[in-house]
């Protein structure tokens, strides 16, 4: 049960592409076949599944070592000894005290993977997943590629992060298919959950503090621990390249700390190659949908506790539809970086000494991380509901079900032409597909008398204007999170559509320059591979041409007859982001003081937006999203319109109002040659 016998005929890892750096059409020969791993669980014994013989094929270059040996190797490493010596000199602390602290840090973070707990988790998750999901679809060719890769080189599993369920389902799949159980980088709050934290630790989780800051010893212990796992091939290592769970359900720009750690053994020549495996996890309905929306509106995130988990068991009574897990083709780091980096420079420094990556290598690592996220996006499986959410957010006053069906079918055709994967049940009629999706998402939408509306929270007593806006915003943000799962499909064509509207002329150069401005502005909002503005522009134009929306020559770009509807629709997808940026720019220019603390900004901008929504001056409730507001500050920092300093352990910003005004004008009126940002792209 659960063995690879049923996939023995599938293609193996040797078909991994030599390079995907330039983002050619992804996995053109990838199979469409997905297998529901819960189908077998519904027919046979969960206890037999958990207790069956588990015999994964290990990495051929690894000598099996125990957890104790792994930890001892870290503590006795020359690298850690060197860093401790540096701290002794800098802080005048005794070596024994620092060694004791390092040992305590390692005890706090390290995993203690034990097969017995994997079996326990496997049994429990079989029960839970059958209650939560109607199906968990997995691409078995991807697992066959992974099985081969695990035997050849150290493997890094890199899933997107949308739910607390993510790492559980991946370990469950690996166990089901007799693949080596990964060790998983997890946040320290999970460790604090009584009993559950220890189960996670013994199921392969190692725990990382979020706020490491300048703690040199912690960095040294963590980085040596990660490098030792990779160097020895102890187990596949899993981490979220986005760093955090996405509260908006769209991709986040990558965090590079772990990426540097896992790649360092390759740079130092300690391993011949490393395989990176992008994994796309797509939910038809997310367990935390309401929680995420309220977090974006400033409601504090509840602490991860065992008691909270037990209270949340009511989710077991609900239906969360299908989940799709797509394992991408393993990518060879050696092949990806071939000809792009001179590894000899790192042979000049002893391997046991800390390694500082030069600017060129840091840029390559950043590009690689961004590419992984783009591959995750391209392998994502869109649901009918994702497409419906795009349309509903452009019709917040409600829409007739027949028209919603018609527009969803139209958008499905556009999405497929844009290269998306869309799950559309073949055994149901179009009306049945729409009806089942509305039923599944009863917490977000309702259908009354043939018309579809967003559902708003209902509370006791009279409702103030502010409470009414808050409830409306929560409903919109819940719906927007599902649109966000599809937004990457439309990003580049939509940016071309906006650039065509704002450019000073229809000349290709003018459209391209405004496209580059939008790309720079939204680089924290949407994921773009650095330095590929031309490729992104060509992709956006190419998709619009392919759909018959535009005509393009070397000199100009024009909308074709019959293409205006698509252009308007695509612009509307980006409109909530554009309006959010416009509102924050207005606040910084007209309402904000010259300097402000981050907390003061959060409360001030929320009050400002609330007033504008109540007065009807703005229409987009997504402006209230705290993530959107943080992304805008990050964009202005990058574009030198803000500066940031630390004062009393708090972030203090200083705003250059004239620079913000120039960016605001460009967003409203289009790029002009007088304000060039080419050097930044």
Model regions: which residues?
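Membrane-interfacial terminal anchoring regions of lipid-handling membrane enzymes
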Residues: 1-681
């Amino acid at each position: 049960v659960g063995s690879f016998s049923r996939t023995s005929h599938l293609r193996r890892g040797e078909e991994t592409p030599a390079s995907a750096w330039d983002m050619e059409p992804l996995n053109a020969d990838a199979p469409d076949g997905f297998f529901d791993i819960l189908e077998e669980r519904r027919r046979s014994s969960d206890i037999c599944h958990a207790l069956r013989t588990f015999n994964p094929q290990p990495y051929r270059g690894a000598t099996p070592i125990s957890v104790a040996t792994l930890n001892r190797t870290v503590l006795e490493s020359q690298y850690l000894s060197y860093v401790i010596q540096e701290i002794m000199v800098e802080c005048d602390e005794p070596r024994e005290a620092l060694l004791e602290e390092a040992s305590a840090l390692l005890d706090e973070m390290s995993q203690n993977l034990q097969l017995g707990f994997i079996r326990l988790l496997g049994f429990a998750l079989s029960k839970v997943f059958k209650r939560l999901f109607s199906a968990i679809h997995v691409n078995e060719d991807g697992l066959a590629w992974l099985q081969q890769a695990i035997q050849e080189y150290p493997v890094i599993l890199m899933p997107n992060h949308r739910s607390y369920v993510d790492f559980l389902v991946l370990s469950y799949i690996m166990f089901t298919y007799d693949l080596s159980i990964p060790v998983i980088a997890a946040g320290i709050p999970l460790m604090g959950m009584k009993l559950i934290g220890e189960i996670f630790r013994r199921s392969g989780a190692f725990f990382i503090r979020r706020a490491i800051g300048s703690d040199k010893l912690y960095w040294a212990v963590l980085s040596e621990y990660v490098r030792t796992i990779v160097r020895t091939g102890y187990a596949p290592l899993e981490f979220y390249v986005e760093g955090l769970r996405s509260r908006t359900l769209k991709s986040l720009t990558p965090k590079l700390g772990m990426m540097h750690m896992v790649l360092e053994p390759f740079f130092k020549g300690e391993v011949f190659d490393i395989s990176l495996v992008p994994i796309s996890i797509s939910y038809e309905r997310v367990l935390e949908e309401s929680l995420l929306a309220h977090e974006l509106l400033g409601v504090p995130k509840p602490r991860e506790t065992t008691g909270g988990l037990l209270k949340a068991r009511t989710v077991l009574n609900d239906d969360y539809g299908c989940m799709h897990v797509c394992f991408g083709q393993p990518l060879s780091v050696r092949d990806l970086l071939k000809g792009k980096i001179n590894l000899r420079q790192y042979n000049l420094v002893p391997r046991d000494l800390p390694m500082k990556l030069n600017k060129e290598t840091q840029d390559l690592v950043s590009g690689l991380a961004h590419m992984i996220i783009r591959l995750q996006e391209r392998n994502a499986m869109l649901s009918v509901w994702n497409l419906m959410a795009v349309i509903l957010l452009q019709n917040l006053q409600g829409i007739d079900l027949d028209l919603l069906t018609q527009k969803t079918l139209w958008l499905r055709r556009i999405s497929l032409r844009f290269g998306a994967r869309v799950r559309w049940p073949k055994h149901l009629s179009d009306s049945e597909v729409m009806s089942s999706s509305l039923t599944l998402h009863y917490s977000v939408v309702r259908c009354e008398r043939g018309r579809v509306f967003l559902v708003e929270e209902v509370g006791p007593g009279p409702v103030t204007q502010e409470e009414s806006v808050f409830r409306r915003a929560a409903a919109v943000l819940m719906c927007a999170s599902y649109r966000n799962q599809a937004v990457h499909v439309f990003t580049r064509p939509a940016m071309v559509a906006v650039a065509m509207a704002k450019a000073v002329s229809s000349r290709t150069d003018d459209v391209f320059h405004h496209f580059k401005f939008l790309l720079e502005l939204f680089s924290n909002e949407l994921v773009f591979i650095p330095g590929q503005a031309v490729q992104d522009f060509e992709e956006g134009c190419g998709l619009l041409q392919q759909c018959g929306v535009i005509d393009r020559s070397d000199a100009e770009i024009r909308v074709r007859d019959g293409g205006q509807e698509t252009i308007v629709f695509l612009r509307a997808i980006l409109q909530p982001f554009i309006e959010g940026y416009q509102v924050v720019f207005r606040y910084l220019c007209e309402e904000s003081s010259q300097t402000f603390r981050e907390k003061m900004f959060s409360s001030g901008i929320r009050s400002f937006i609330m007033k504008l929504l109540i007065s009807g001056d703005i229409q987009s409730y997504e402006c209230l999203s705290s993530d959107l507001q943080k992304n805008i500050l990050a964009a202005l920092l990058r574009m030198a319109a803000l500066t940031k300093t630390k004062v009393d352990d708090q972030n203090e910003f200083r705003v250059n109002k004239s620079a913000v005004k120039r960016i605001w004008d460009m967003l409203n009126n289009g790029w002009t040659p007088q304000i060039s940002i080419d050097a930044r792209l």
